[in-house]
Design a protein with these regions (language model features):
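Acidic-and-aromatic substrate-binding clefts and catalytic sites of carbohydrate-active enzymes
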Residues: 32-35, 84
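Surface-exposed cleft-lining segments at the edges of enzyme active sites
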Residues: 23-32
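Exposed alpha-helical structural elements
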Residues: 1, 20-24, 41, 72, ...
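A metal-dependent, Asp-based hydrolase signature
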Residues: 1-23
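Catalytic-core regions built around general acid/base machinery
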Residues: 37-48
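Asp-based, Mg2+/Mn2+-dependent phosphohydrolase catalytic module
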Residues: 43, 52-175
Length: 175
């Protein structure tokens, strides 16, 4: 998908790119940096929760990205596994079917993500609780993702994974 998008954007902007340029860009996902707070936050959350990934990348790219996160996920479901990309309903159906077979009911899922379009809108449609990591809180728009239309409902909203961890720690202290 990324090589096609790269080619179309280059054409739209009047930039010449070769087929190899497009393929190389598509393979670059595994080299993209993780958000600075993600490894530590995920390692902390892993102590308390099962962690599952529903990703819009292929398996090879995810493996390279995951090496930067330094956490063992309980399950990983990629677009390559599913055969489609979020926000397609099939991705969420696939994840929920797999989680159910692992004994995890959808009522126990907290879908945590940044993209309103790719994640929170379909999470709403499947009745999942959701947590918006609103990293663009100081900026307008939705970044590289499409506007979701109407704003989906979210159960929690944090500006970073670090803020999510702080809220969890505060909740534990208050018990």
């Amino acid at each position: 998908m990324l090589p096609i998008v790269y080619k179309r954007l280059a054409e739209e902007w009047g930039i010449h790119v070769t087929h190899e340029d497009c393929v190389q860009y598509g393979r670059s996902v595994g080299n993209w940096p993780a958000f600075e707070d993600s490894p530590g936050a995920l390692q902390y959350l892993k102590k308390y929760f099962k962690l599952v990934i529903l990703s819009n990348v292929d398996n090879e790219s995810f493996q390279a990205s995951n090496a930067k996160l330094k956490v063992q996920f309980d399950a990983v479901y990629t677009a390559e596994d599913v055969g489609s990309y979020k926000p397609a309903p099939r991705n969420f159906e696939y994840m929920l079917e797999k989680l159910d077979s692992l004994g995890v009911k959808k009522e126990k899922v907290l879908h945590t993500a940044e993209s309103m379009f790719h994640d929170h809108k379909p999470a709403n449609e499947f009745g999942l609780a959701s947590c918006w990591i609103y990293r663009r809180h100081a900026q307008e728009g939705f970044g590289a993702t499409m506007h979701p239309g109407g704003m989906p409902r979210v159960d929690f909203n944090f500006n970073s994974m670090h803020d999510l961890v702080k809220a969890h720690q505060e909740q534990l202290r208050d018990k």
